[in-house]
């Protein structure tokens, strides 16, 4: 099997992400990285978020052996005017799910964690690429997901607590797209590596992989999805957003005028600056998030 470990040591997670975005590696590789306190996400820190009511059902999911937990197993029984609010989490239910072997997946912790948000803002501006941050908390000796491929240009894994065993398979087959859910074959395994705290693994788009926590304790890792954004994609996103916001009574002439105005504005602006504004928007307090564009 391939040896994924390199002698590279990154001084910070920011350096790791920026280097990945700029060099665009073509094969998986493992290295070491210094994890600052701001990025040191552990089960205890997740408990703090949970007890503070900062995590909602919109930003978390649970999976055990590739089977998702239903909303009823995590949502609070809290009622307002006689109606349940399912987006509120029950801390007790969440802990029972994890204790029973479910992996907890948190998306976008920058929404409530100011330290992570400030770091993400700095990193996205430096690498000129979008960033999707997730936290995976996996009970010892368990696996949340089966073999699969991710659509991000790069997935950058950083182990922050415990240990996790990663199995790498093959590169995406010719013609692979994000809509192809065909799983890598077991015989296609090409490498295996155990990540301890401070280890990192970079997985290029579509490369087959699977992971499971080691038996010694809970595993927590950060997963950063890094995606390059072209000026053309930015223009398409802006056009779609503008068309969606138009009134149903808008005429064909109104639609054509809105389209031409956007194209003219885009051509007059500096494309690189527009991309930087786009990728950093989710982490600037008070600005529109990407979904609002």
Q: Language-model segments: which ranges?
A:
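Hydrophobic alpha-helical hairpins/lids featuring a short glycine-rich hinge
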Residues: 78-137
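Short, conserved secondary-structure segments in the cores of folded domains
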Residues: 145, 154-155, 191
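An N-terminal JmjN-like helical accessory module and its immediate linker preceding a catalytic domain
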Residues: 1-62, 66-69
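A short beta-strand-loop-beta hairpin characteristic of the jelly-roll/cupin
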Residues: 163-197
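Conserved metal-binding segment of the jelly-roll/cupin
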Residues: 160, 193-212
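Fe(II)/2-oxoglutarate
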Residues: 1-15, 22-27, 182-194, 210-293
